Amino acid sequence: MPKLVGKNGDEAVPTCGRCDKSGRWCDRSQSLRIRAQKNVGKHDEAAIHALGATQAKTADIRDPQSALQDEDIANYFEHYLKELAPWYDLNDLDMTFAVVVARRALRSQLLLSAIIAFAAVHKSRTGHAASKTLAETHHAHCLRLLIGLDNDDIEIRDGTALAATCLLRSYEILSEEEDPNRHLFGAFSLIPLLSSALPSEQLLRAGLWNYLREDITFSLINECPLKIELGEVNVEPRRDDDYASQITLLLGRLINAAFAKEQFTVERLRQAVSHWYSTCPFRPYHESHGSGFPRIRMLQNCHCAAMHYYYVAMCLVDVSNARPARLEEYARLICGSTFTANNDPTMRCEVVEKGR
């Protein structure tokens, strides 16, 4: 005999759908009593007020100069300048993301909204008081602006859109438990074709190097070739960060050859990497080895990052040639130089052992 149930139904007559599915019969002998939930009004009022304030801040960003008069927005902007921009300028002595991006954000709502989204989510994930709702709202606003761009728009041609996408890529990594790589893949359409020369526009060039480093990390973790086509482009080293860019290109080409099982190309690139190391003008000013990781100190972050890529390149060569004897040595060198780096951005450098 079906059970009599007097609650949890959907009030359909004669029998609610829930009871019909489970073989029960609704008991309607007593009237339905509805209990009010306490404090709903206060909670909703506070939530609506917070949402309205967040939306107002986003609307104001259409005028970046006015938006930065808001103390919260100014604090997030300053957090980007002090803490986050150095992540992107790791191999850039011109500090393009700290200087050019920041200056351009004063008149670009696309860049400013990307900066605020990234800075807010970073603060929320690192124990600071920060609004995740604000980060999400600015992220959505930035995406709408990006989607609305045409190929001929100046923000595509001058690197603004690519720089914003690089910032959103970092937002994506911090805001989600699993990295969906949406912005990494999306940035691919903004990358200029590389045939024999790098782009002349400074911000476009800086965005390209950042995208390439992200592409390298993704390829190492997933053991696949790069998405970006490197062509025959090369860097003529004139200063120290040029050497870091040069080894970045060599590592990218080596990744393509190693995962495509092109042993002849791997050997040719091994010789190029060895030549790079022999001509590289910087070395550690201190190196000591104990029972733990070695302590390796270098003058500049770009020196440390360049040597990281050199060690990773040599790991790939050894794996491709089935010579794993020095893999642990290279891994220890990477970790040692990271833990004794000048400052935090280098800690974010491409230390790929955890992905390998």
Question: What role is predicted for each listed range?
Answer:
Residues 1-95, 99-108, 129, 135-136, ...:
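Charge-rich, intrinsically disordered regulatory segments
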Residues 80, 98-104, 114-128, 137-178, ...:
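Hydrophobic/aromatic-rich effector regions of fungal transcription factors
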Residues 113, 162, 205, 209, ...:
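Start-of-helix signal in alpha-solenoid helical-repeat scaffolds, especially tetratricopeptide repeats
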Residues 127-131, 323-324:
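Structural helix-adjacent loops and short alpha-helical linkers that scaffold large soluble proteins
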